[in-house]
Structure formats: structure tokens, C-alpha cells
Amino acid sequence: MWIGVISLFPEMFKAITEFGVTGRAVKHNLLKVECWNPRNFTFDKHKTVDDRPYGGGPGMLMMVQPLRDAIHTAKAAAGEGAKVIYLSPQGRKLDQDGVTELAQNQKLILVCGRYEGIDERLIQTEIDEEWSIGDYVLTGGELPAMTLIDAVARFIPGVLGKQASAEEDSFADGLLDCPHYTRPEVLEGLTVPPVLMSGHHEEIRKWRLKQSLQRTWFRRPELLEGLALTDEQRKLLKEAQAEHNS
């Protein structure tokens, strides 16, 4: 997968390209991240990248010309088929369905805004989609872009040790993840559920599914409203609800 990034702070993306799972993906050529800094497309000695908004008001906008030229350069490098995304609080909220959808693209260009944002006409002419990571405002689009890259990279074949890891994560099937345990067997007086040490794989599967359903019902009940549960899931959910209410 190829991802181009337009950012005034490309150094921030070393967190993605040099560390952890995504860093290994880059090292093994499963993921390529290229950055373009609008400052490199300026023509004045101060490398100005901000400009005053028409109509006045507080704050500045990103200057059109350097940003536009950076986007065009990224598009040329990507070739055909690249989807251009602007990270914005006004965008579609990123969830697991959205991540799965975006992961189907082989090429993405992520535009990271700064200041008060970018000219609306650039959104109309250069941007394919706007995406948000939540209903709050950050100082720039870099952290949302890194969040998006990390999330979609998990779906690239070979990035995770086991593809099942991505398939069993929270939200992968619309449910929250089940609890997980590792050594020691007893921690602060709390023990590992016996079923997990039983070696009975079918019982372990059912326990994990039941815990996932219970956790979703208790913490994020709205997630269950849009799901078509299987007969087994409905049965396990009823059991979990009865146990909780008893």
C-alpha cells in the first residue's frame, strides 16, 4: 500500500515509518509512506504557508498555492487511482467500517491541515473525501492522519503476524473485544478465568464471544442496534444479560 502525506511537519510521521507494526511494514516494503511539505513549494524567503481569511476573523488559513502545488506533486507521484483525503473535524467520522473501506485502496493521499484549515475551493477541487477521527478539534491533521494510517495498515496482508489478529480486534465484527489475560495466573488476588486454561478450544471460543457481547451491551449498547446477530450470539447475549441482572 502507498500513502502520500501533505504536512507542514513531515518529521512527525517517523512515529509511523520507524516504529512498531507500521515501521516493520515499511521496512518489509508492505507499506510505503511519502511526505511533501508545502513549505518546499513556496517562493518567498520566509517560506510563508499561511494567509489571512477573507471576511476577517481570528486565525489564519493555509496558503493556497504551496498547498495546491504539494497536492499536485503527490498526485503525480501516485499516478492514477489515488484517493485524496482531507483530515477535518467536518468529515465523516472514522470507524471500523470506514477503516475497512479505506483499506481497499492501494493508494491514498492524506492532506493535513493546520491553522484554521484550508480554502473551501481546494476541498471542492482537490479533495475526494473528508474524514474525522472524532468530535473534537486538534491543532493539525497529522495525528488523525497517523491514526488512519495505523488503522488501515493492519489490513495489509503480511503486516500482522496473524491476519486473525485484525479480524478479531474490537469492532472487526461490530462488537467490542473480549478480555485478555497473560501470566501470572494470579495478579493482585485476581485469577485467570479457568476456561482459558482448559485447552477446550470450542468452550474458549464461546466464552470469548459471550464476553464480547456482554462488554458491548454494557459499554456500547448502541453498537448492537445495527447488528444482525446470529442465533448463537442472541443466545449468549441473553445468558450474559441474565447473569448480569441476577
Swiss-Prot record:
Biological processes annotated in GO: tRNA N1-guanine methylation
Positions in coiled-coil regions: none
UniProt keywords, alphabetically: Cytoplasm, Methyltransferase, S-adenosyl-L-methionine, Transferase, tRNA processing
Recorded catalytic activity of this chain's protein: guanosine(37) in tRNA + S-adenosyl-L-methionine = N(1)-methylguanosine(37) in tRNA + S-adenosyl-L-homocysteine + H(+)
Location of the protein in the cell: Cytoplasm
Enzyme class, UniProt record, top EC level: transferase
Major localization listed first in the record, in broad terms: cytoplasm
GO molecular function: tRNA (guanine(37)-N1)-methyltransferase activity
Amino-acid positions noted as binding S-adenosyl-L-methionine in the UniProt annotation, renumbered to this chain: G113, I133, G134, D135, Y136, V137, L138
HAMAP family in the record: TrmD
Subunit field text: Homodimer.
Descriptive protein name: tRNA (guanine-N(1)-)-methyltransferase
Lineage of origin: Bacteria, Pseudomonadati, Pseudomonadota, Gammaproteobacteria, Pasteurellales
Chain's gene name: trmD
